[in-house]
Amino acid sequence: MPAPERVPPGPVTTAPAEPAPAGSVTALLTGGELTVRGRIAEASNAVLHCTVVHQGRTAACVYKRVAGEQPLWDFPDGTLAQREVAAYEVCAALGWELIPPTVLREGPYGPGMVQLWIDQADEEPGEPAGPGGAPEAGENASGPVPVGHLLALADAERPAPEGWRAIGLAEVPGGGTALLVHADDARLRRLAVLDAVINNSDRKGGHLLTTADGRLFGIDHGVTFHTEDKLRTLLWGWAGEPLPEEAVAALGRLATALGEEAPLTTRLAALITPAEVTALGDRVAALLASGTHPVPGGEWPAIPWPPV
């Protein structure tokens, strides 16, 4: 992308599309004083763990500075933070609380994305990786073995167990093959729709966080909103199936919110390019027209690597 078309770092004005509690969190993230507590070493880009304090309120958060982003061949430099904020805006417009409150602001090391920290629920090694009737790991010889939250490995010679959806075959230590599955979970299904909308090219298992009170969040949305089809995800279990009625209703709300000169469109225009805003609207329209979950296109790897 030529330099003039790149989206420069800058502040975003966040009109409250979330319920009041989330709105107060975005005010805290936007106006609070950031203090860096440490760096998350396993992240591919510079990710700092911080606390933010504003008007007597304190919260933990993640700060990803634009200057710490690694160059990518297919995304313009210095735009990943803006894409993370755009993903939050779109998720809020859908009416789903699947992405933690996220803002664009100045930080101790320059402009970047600041996102509320999510405390992930501890998962015991023997627990099933998903809810809703999934068999217990070890219940029988073909039962799924959890590999992370909402993901599991199952017998490659059998269909996906009840309560799980097949993703594909995976090599396991020792040279064997297992069936990688994800939970047949309504929260994951919403996230699959969101990923199709924002054209997420990196939905890995490690980007799924569950909380002690049963909420699900997706994180790491920097490689999104490309104008070309780059959907790459683990959540293919519903491919080709009709969209749930609640997803169709949410997409209809989003289509309305993306109207010309609408507040959401104005906010997105400060975060991604005009062509990317147009492509976003086209994807929403295509999902509504088809009424089904997308299927892998074949021109782009369908599953990210590593998947978990």
Which residues fall in each region the model found?
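Alpha-helical scaffolds flanking conserved acidic
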Residues: A186-L191
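Short, glycine/acidic-enriched loop or turn micro-motifs at the edges of active sites
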Residues: I198, G205, V223-T224
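Conserved ATP-binding subdomain of kinase catalytic cores across diverse folds
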Residues: L28-P173, T177-A178, V193-N200, A212-I219
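Helix-boundary and loop/linker segments of multi-pass membrane transporters
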Residues: L180-D184
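Juxta-kinase regulatory segment immediately upstream of eukaryotic protein kinase catalytic domains
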Residues: M1-G31
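Short loop/turn hinge sites at secondary-structure boundaries
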Residues: A22-A27, G31-R37, N199, V284-G298
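C-terminal catalytic region of ATP-dependent kinase domains
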Residues: T211-V308
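Hydrophobic residue at the +6 position relative to the catalytic HRD Asp in the kinase catalytic loop
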Residues: G206-T210
